Amino acid sequence: MTHLIETFTSVLHQSALKPSRLIVAFSGGVDSRVLLELAAQYAQTHGIECCAVHVHHGLSKNADLWAEQCQTWCDALSVSLAVERVSLDINCGESVEKLARDARYQAFQQHIRQGDVLVTGQHIDDQLETFLLALKRGSGPKGLSSMAKVMSFGEAFIVRPLLSVTRLDIEASAHDMGLTWVEDESNQDLRFDRNFIRHQVTPTLTERWPSFRESVCRSAQLCAEQESLLDELLESHLQQALGGCNSKSNSKSNSKSQSLSIDSLSQHSDLLRARLIRMWLSHCNQPMPSQKQLKLIWDEVACAQADANPKLVLNDVEIRRFNNQLYLVQDTKDLSSWKSEILIDENLLLPDGLGEIHLKAVSSGSASHNRDVQRFSLTKANGTLRVIFNPEGVSAHPVGRGHSRKLKKLFQEYQVPSWLRRRTPILMDGDRVIAVLGLFVDKNYEGQDCEALWSK
């Protein structure tokens, strides 16, 4: 126990993090059982809070018993425990291992605050398995880097303080401390790749080469260092290729990050261009694409015909092109049929997380100084005020323009990306456009007695 608490403390101190809370990823297995003891002791010594999160996957008939047992152990240490129940769609085509892992980290995210540290119980044997799985998939240096000892996690951090410790060492410490733990029967199922490596591959390799674990971890560390160095050397190229949203619309874009200049990318070699796209996706917290997907991003999206509206679905987002820029866009609902009345001095909540519209009458001299506010007059209004998202067949005459045009053409002129054109609210007076929020006011409603603010 003494050497493990020293290892635990050393890793946290070397990370230079000063958490106000430790959150323990607590499955109840031997690794996390020892981790809980270490975290509770560290928290008590350093005067910080220690909490735990147990994820109930519902995959085992024993899952309820495990949750109850975890609660008992946490109570004995005065550690608060949150039990998160998740459901997995095991028929979606993804491996159960990946589904469970993704669900766990989504559950952990629900309990993380800024400045927290989530500690997890992975050890050197887990690192070896992760490396071999990446090798089996044909991963490059990034995948072969395996698990980092410290990594960002939203506004918090994940720390793996036992990554240099063997599974046998953890089990020996658990026995020395007189601990009990749960045994997940699925860990013996050789249909799962990680279990196959653990029970069939690793013993043979380590019997032949006793230091094989340490050698693999050294290779993983070297891969991580090379990746970090390459990112550092190419950061200036990425910054040159990155751009802000070129759209003049203030619409909520649902873009995950800045856009990427196709002109800038085209100046580089195939290898460098692919690397910059990977770096961009990494900055957007997206899983790394395969080589085939990278080629599709460039060939079928970036290099599509000028009049095309190309897109590529990548995981749960879309890669889109607009104004010779690549965008990462969240999958969104079709709001074409959505409409709602709105009253003066009332707020209207928009669908699909698009914020709300504040509409109010203003007297002379009391207008808002907020630059996002649009001012107009309703003295000529004679219809029902409503908000719609469907621009089909609708025309408007923006203030300062010589004539009216279809909204479809105006959206193009105002450089609104195609995926936002049915997500930009249109304020209507009956069948006439008063304003397109974030873009313009119609000439027929020019004035200062009313103002609208679209808060995203």
Swiss-Prot record:
InterPro entries: Lysidine-tRNA-synth_C, Rossmann-like_a/b/a_fold, TilS/TtcA_N, tRNA_Ile_lys_synt, tRNA_Ile_lys_synt_N, tRNA_Ile_lys_synt_subst-bd. GO terms for cellular component: cytoplasm. It catalyses: cytidine(34) in tRNA(Ile2) + L-lysine + ATP = lysidine(34) in tRNA(Ile2) + AMP + diphosphate + H(+). Its main location: cytoplasm. Its EC number is 6.3.4.19. Pfam families: ATP_bind_3, TilS, TilS_C. It comes from the Bacteria. Belongs to the tRNA(Ile)-lysidine synthase family. HAMAP family: tRNA_Ile_lys_synt (MF_01161). This is tRNA(Ile)-lysidine synthase. It comes from Vibrio atlanticus (strain LGP32) (Vibrio splendidus (strain Mel32)). The lineage of its organism: Bacteria, Pseudomonadati, Pseudomonadota, Gammaproteobacteria, Vibrionales.
